[in-house]
Amino acid sequence: MLFSRSGRSIFPLLPPYAAHAPNPNQGHIIALPPDGLTPYLGLRARLSQVWINRWTILLLLVLVRVLLAASGLQADMSTAKREALSACTSVESMGSSMASMPHYLSQGVNELTATGVEKAVSGLKSMLMLTITGVEELVLFIIKVLYQTYLCLFTLAVRGSVHVAVGVIKEAADFLNSTVKEVGDDIGKAVSTFESAFNKFLDGVNTVASAFGASVPTLDLNSSISTLENLQLPSSIDQGLDKLNSSLPTFDEVNNFTQTVLRTPFEEVKKLVNESLGTYTFDRSLLPVPAKEQLTFCEGSNGIDSFFDSVTDLVMKARKIFIAILIVAATLACVPMAWQEIRRWRSMKERSQLVRKEAHDPMDVVYIVSRPYTAAAGIKAASRFSNSRRQILVRWAIAYATTPAALFVLCLGVAGLLSCLCQYLLLQAVEKTVPELSTQVGAFADKVVDSLQNASAEWANDANGVIGHMSQDLNENVFGWVNTSTTALNDTLNTFVDKTTGVLNDTFGGTLLYEPLMDVFGCLIGLKVQGIQKGLTWVHDHAHIDFPLLPNDTFSRGAAASISSNSSNPSDSFLADAGDQTSNKITEVVIRVVNKVEDGIRTETIISGVIILIWVFIALIGIVRALTLFWVRDRNRGEGGGARVNHHLSDAGGFIDVPLMAVSNTNTDARSMPPPAPAPRYEASTSTVVASRAVPVSSTHHEDEKLGFAGERQYGSALKVDGAADLRGSSYVEYDMEKR
């Protein structure tokens, strides 16, 4: 194709299309033959570049970023593996130290246990001595109170009765003795008088009788009277009562006997307690000392290696999946893009006819042809409005937000978010494997705790055996005598009751006082003695000692509690350092890598979001600009508005020819091609269809039309269809779009 110098000098951006016209003066564009050369790309040429469409390139960039992230994650995991193995070695050393801790702690615990036992035995000795002494004096006091009370009552009853009886007998005897003597004296006097008179009478009788040779005896009653005068009660009448009064028991013998009998077992028990617990020393050599432990769970353990190998396999698998998916997606993106190019090519060919038709706004035509999809989107959105001004503003806002630069920013942000999504999916897959490592580390901790529990249980069993043997020895050697003493005390009380009963039986047996005295004895003493015997029986049944035994988890309870699920603070684990957020140093390494990758993804997401916000800001600029002019009414010519361009009649095809004025071309080729027409220039068509002549266009009007800013061009100069009247007051062309 030949380009004239004059054509380029007059309108250098357009080639001399009229050079191919059979009649250069006609001014119509003649299509080139299908197999001819064209300065623009044809369909095949366009399809040859489908593989470098923006979506394929963006997907490939996403793939590259994901591959870089996977490589970085793999490198970080390699570093984490080394750190984890190092941490495992540290944990192994710490676990060995903890497992050996019973060896070191047992010595102090054994000393503490032995000292506690010695202090307990010393306190037991003091308590026993005080208790035995207190019980001894208490028993003696109670018995003394009992028999002295009984003695007082007995003395009051018996001695009082005897004293009364003896007094009565003495007074009766004295009264009888004095009365009998007086009666004898009186009788003696009377008898003496009678005897004197009678003897005188007998003397007379004897005088008479002597005459007859006989005599009468005299009366002599003096001896009988003397006997009556000397009559008195025998002194032995109250000797029995005096003997009974003097023979009342004072229970001194019972008191001495009882105290001797009661104190004997108590003193024996005190002696035995002093001999058994005089200076008690616990044999510390009997308590065991566990041996040291050496734990090995890093060497020959596939826990950490298998975890990181699985993570590496996961990353490699994810890399392959992303490569396959993104490459397939990038390849498949070529199919719709090829179809889009075909449709774009067809649309360009169809819309290129607008150049030959009545085109009042050539820049709009060029925009529609060059940006078919964004222009179609704008036309679709504008079809919702009936006002041509608002239609243009809507199209302008969409065109402003869909410029190549704006779409590049949007695609870049979307690609960044897609890359972050792929990295996030990869990170989530890695995070799901962290519990597996925690399980492996938990197995390490369980090994340490199991070793501690075994050592603690073995030590506790041996120590408890020693403590149990000591408790048995104390029960036999100390509390055995307590049992013996309670039995002896019960026997002593029985002896006391029997002895007292024997004394009462010997004293009052067969008398009227025996039964009442025995009832009083049973009420005052017998019931109390029975209560004491019950208490002694209870002491006999419960007199034993049981020292508390050591629990089996003495050395392992704290370690087991630190790794249990009930622990609220993960840093309490013995595998973690102070301030660690995870339960152990091994998983801390992996968590640190995951947090690092997560921070990187978060940063990239923020950057991608900011890029998308930049596009949103650009779109908002266009929307705000359109809204600013949306409600502004059209300016009339008198208010500074432009003049209305007259519309001309169309031809039978419905379009007005736009003549392309050509300039002469001095260059000819070997085929003697006709001189090309000058560069095309848009002109307003006349009312006739055939004639086409050049109509000068104002430079100011040309500049207004070329700017393309909303509100800066003549809205009435838009494309018009069929030359019909604008029923809606708009000269905006309808591109086969139904307005609603």
Swiss-Prot record:
The record's subcellular location field reads:
Cell membrane
List the keywords (alphabetical). Cell membrane, Conjugation, Glycoprotein, Membrane, Transmembrane, Transmembrane helix
Kindly state one GO CC term assigned in the UniProt record: mating projection tip
Q: Which GO terms describe its biological process?
A: plasma membrane fusion involved in cytogamy
Disulfide partners = none
Chain ranges passing through the membrane: 55-75, 138-158, 321-341, 398-418, 604-624
Which superkingdom is the protein from? Eukaryota
Membrane topology label: Multi-pass membrane protein
User: So which residues have sugars stuck on them?
Assistant: N177, N222, N245, N256, N274, N454, N483, N490, N505, N552, N566
Q: Which residues lie on this side of the membrane: Cytoplasmic?
A: 76-137, 342-397, 625-740
Extracellular topological intervals: 1-54, 159-320, 419-603
* UniProt similarity note: Belongs to the PRM1 family.
As for what it does, the entry says: Involved in cell fusion during mating by stabilizing the plasma membrane fusion event.
What's the protein name?
Plasma membrane fusion protein prm1
